[in-house]
Amino acid sequence: MSARRREPGLVAALAFLAALLPNAAAQTLPPSPTPTSLLSRPYGRSVVDIQTVRAHPGGVLAVQVRGGRWTSANTLLDGRRGSIALENGKLFGIIPLALDTEPAEHKLSLFFPGGRRRGGSTSVMVPVTGVARPTRPRTLTPDALASAGSQTALGHARFLLAAIRTRDLKAYQSGPLRPPVEGPVVFPFGGAEDYGMEMGPVKDGLMGEHHRGVDYDVPAGTTVKAPGSGIILLARSLAFSGETVVIGHGRGLVSVLSHLTHVSVREGDVVSQGTAVGTSGKTGLGALTPHLCFSVYLHSLNVDPEALMDATLWPAVK
């Protein structure tokens, strides 16, 4: 038998959460800071550019099609469908990679509208590389363990998950996100979290085997700013994440700011990148010390916030 103890209420709650959340040829190629990470493939009179600098489990791919008259294209990667659309006059999109993506080559397919004469499809094999991530122990108090499986906590989780799954075709944000606070990162996205007990088949819940965001070491009361322009989808106190702000940036991109002490925006507010939305703190079951947890979801897949802050993904659409 395993030496680790089980907490049935918590495991059931985490399993419930996990179930709800399934990551032109004549033109000159844009310069790239890391040329070896940029894949370019001709397709008719067009060129498909794929930036793989952040192609790791929980990372993203940036795709741009140069040339042609298409205004959109559908994508398929590891069985997940997506799309790219015009951004600042460029056919461009960010495609998420799930945290459990195997480090290997994966086939990315693009499907263009217009029938046989003007449409068609093409595929590119894209390398995904593994990354080393740390582990940290996590000790929850008996009260926190009891609260984790409560109906109140599960109800709060539904609010958060509904916000994460919001679909909005409008693009509020163009270009990379920015850090919501100034401070050192003390624990990265995707790091393993050891709760000292069996977590069950949790793979992509709000708590579980891996950290869902980036933790910044900042004192309570630090101003927290919107990492990108968008609409406030949720601004309320939740059991797991405490005082929480969820921002919808459009086109499937959602950011979550957790454990705040104070929230200064309301649901439905439209904010610009850099707008103050609250102050950091230590609220919620998941906060053991004052800090800010910043999480990002793209088409409901949890991805590395630092990948979406990488300006090299947008070199050609500026």
Regions found by a protein language model. Give the residues of each.
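Bacterial N-terminal signal peptides
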Residues: 11-20
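Surface-exposed, glycine-biased beta-strand/turn segments
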Residues: 122-242
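Bacterial N-terminal signal peptides that target proteins for export
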Residues: 2-11
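Short, surface-exposed secondary-structure boundary micro-motifs
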Residues: 66, 219, 237, 275-276, ...
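Short, well-structured beta-strand-loop connectors
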Residues: 223-233, 265-280
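Cationic-aromatic interfacial patches
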Residues: 28-125, 130
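Zn2+-dependent peptidoglycan hydrolase active-site motif and core
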Residues: 227-264, 289-291, 295
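Conserved, short, structured surface segments that act as functional micro-motifs
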Residues: 245-248, 269-318
